[in-house]
């Protein structure tokens, strides 16, 4: 399987997002989850329901400003799924070229019914990213992408090869400016959860 196969669309009814596997963990942005909605992913032909109450770690901060005391991340244990993706334990450096990979729903016309369907196909979106600013040392990094991201891209990974440097958690509307929760901060959360 390719690295893109371990990055999947999260179907949340009225709330969409993206997440990915690192080892046997599934990672996404916490704000992807809306109250009262069932969120699920499809991986290896199987539907997996994500219940935030069963997360190893879950936090969805209030407001649009990233807060180092409230990381915007959800981490789930998915035993049996073993991804080759790994977390970087260091921050990317300014000017480093990275890729953000997302999946989006694609509206296609159903020939038989004559109506559009949003469930037929998923599109892989790759954005070339350059680190422009590193803030909060180990918690966040700010990037500028070559395509403007949208709300449904939240939770997608910032990568170099199979190494994940962060998770998309915020962006400035109508601009290529994005903020990623750093992998280094997520590794710290996982270690604390295993203590």
Predicted regions and their residues:
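Solvent-exposed, flexible loop/coil residues
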Residues: 36, 153, 184
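Intrinsic disorder/low-complexity segments, especially N-terminal tails and targeting/processing regions
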Residues: 24, 50, 58, 181, ...
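Serine endopeptidase catalytic core focused on the charge-relay Asp
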Residues: 5-14, 20-23, 30-139, 159-161
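C-terminal cap/linker of serine protease catalytic domains
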Residues: 165-195
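Short beta->alpha transition motifs characteristic of CBS
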Residues: 29-34, 105, 150-151, 165-175
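Catalytic nucleophile loop of clan PA
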Residues: 20-21, 146-169
């Amino acid at each position: 399987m390719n690295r893109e196969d371990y990055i999947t669309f999260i179907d949340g009814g009225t709330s969409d997002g993206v997440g990915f596997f690192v080892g046997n963990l599934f990672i996404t942005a916490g704000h992807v989850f809306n109250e009262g909605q069932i969120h699920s992913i499809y991986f290896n032909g199987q539907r997996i329901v994500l219940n935030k109450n069963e997360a190893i770690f879950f936090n969805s901060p209030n407001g649009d400003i990233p807060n180092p005391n409230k990381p915007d991340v959800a981490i789930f244990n998915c035993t049996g799924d073993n991804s080759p993706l790994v977390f970087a334990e260091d921050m990317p450096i300014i000017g480093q070229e990275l890729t953000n990979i997302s999946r989006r729903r694609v509206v296609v016309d159903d020939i038989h019914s004559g109506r559009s369907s949003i469930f037929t196909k998923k599109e892989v979106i790759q954005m070339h990213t350059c680190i422009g600013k590193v803030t909060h040392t180990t918690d966040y990094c700010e990037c500028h992408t070559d395509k403007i991201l949208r709300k449904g891209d939240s939770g997608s990974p910032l990568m170099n090869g199979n190494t994940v440097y962060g998770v998309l958690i915020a962006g400035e509307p109508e601009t290529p400016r994005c903020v990623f929760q750093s992998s280094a901060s997520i590794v710290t959360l996982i270690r604390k959860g295993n203590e």
